[in-house]
Amino acid sequence: MIEYIRGELAALTPAQAVIEAAGVGYALGISLNTYTVLQGKREVKLYVHEAIVTGGRDDSYTLYGFATVQERALYRLLITVSGVGANTARMILSSITPKELCNIIAGGDERMLKSVKGIGVRTAQRIIVDLKDKIVASGIADELRAVSKPGTPAVDTTVRDEAVSALTMLGFSPAPSAKVVQSILTEQPTLPVEQVVKQALKLIK
């Protein structure tokens, strides 16, 4: 399983990014949100979702890339909803920022979801009903609020990602791990990875 790809941005369009890493060019489908983040950058890192389809006439293997773990987590939640496929989920994340999407689902705002191309009344309702509690339980909304809170010291994303990865390898779930790590780094943004992990082990449940 590919967790993320880091390398040189070889090509970029609003729908796709090509990253060259260790001599291999990886083509990843992206949202407009991720496209905006990548513009003007040379060295990039994208969190990966692998979509493998088998059993039909044409098997397929597609990579999707996301600028943040939160956007990827939302994508993975969206594709669990009946009627929301890979392209529809990407369209939603191209039309609405991750933070806005969390607020829309939490507030039950069907109208805003219906403004996305391809989303009708029933699909909008299913997204809200199916994901409202899951988003709260996952901690995604809390992470996004912490990242965007005015006056919050900048968090070293490399330290954050490595700490979350370490906790995941130790057997903890990614969502609560990310929430605890984000909380620690918001309060102490200069902590090294090993100290973040040690503190997280005392706090994570």
Model features per residue range: what roles?
Residues 1-5:
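Short coil-to-beta-strand transition motifs
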Residues 7-9:
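Conserved hydrophobic positions within beta-strands
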Residues 11-111, 127, 137, 144, ...:
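Long, highly charged, low-complexity intrinsically disordered interaction regions
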Residues 89, 101, 124, 177-181, ...:
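Small-residue helix-packing motif on alpha-helices
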Residues 119-137:
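Alpha-helical interaction/regulatory segments in DNA maintenance proteins
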Residues 140-142, 146-205:
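Low-complexity, acidic/Ser/Thr- and charged residue-rich accessory regions of DNA metabolism proteins
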Residues 73-77, 88, 109-112, 159-166, ...:
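A general alpha-helix detector
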